[in-house]
């Protein structure tokens, strides 16, 4: 485990304290996030995940999600290109949980994009579809059927909890989520009911 190795390096006096502390803090944040995701998925399994639904313009939530990943976007040299209609798209959702789901997919997209991430939003009379597409290498075909499975790590080596939790959040909103490969990169599509 990286935290233990860096802490032992500091203790033995063989590592630079500042850079080792930075790695320890980053890994601690990652572990905290993983524990929170595991707790939330456990609450969903037990039927204890209470959602606070309110009506809102989904475009505002999407802009908030873009702002949440902005530091990573800037440091990685990635551009997020939003494409939303001018008129409001009203949905009933748990603002915090839905933002978490969208931000998770955006964060993944930023990680795998080469230069650009497209975020589009379209609505018909019944549903709003949110599409997030990166310009990376896409998802390995062997991983696609399992991308939302709990603990499935695939070639990325990540914990396999984030996308599973995202799917559960979308399902709690009576929506669907799917992943596929587009002409360039991975495409994630979320569909949830509109409220009016």
Over which residues does each language-model region extend?
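Conserved micro-motifs of the catalytic ATP-binding
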Residues: 46-51, 90-93
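A conserved beta-strand-to-alpha-helix junction within the catalytic ATP-binding
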Residues: 52-70, 81
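Conserved catalytic submotifs in the C-terminal HATPase_c
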Residues: 54-55, 74, 79-89
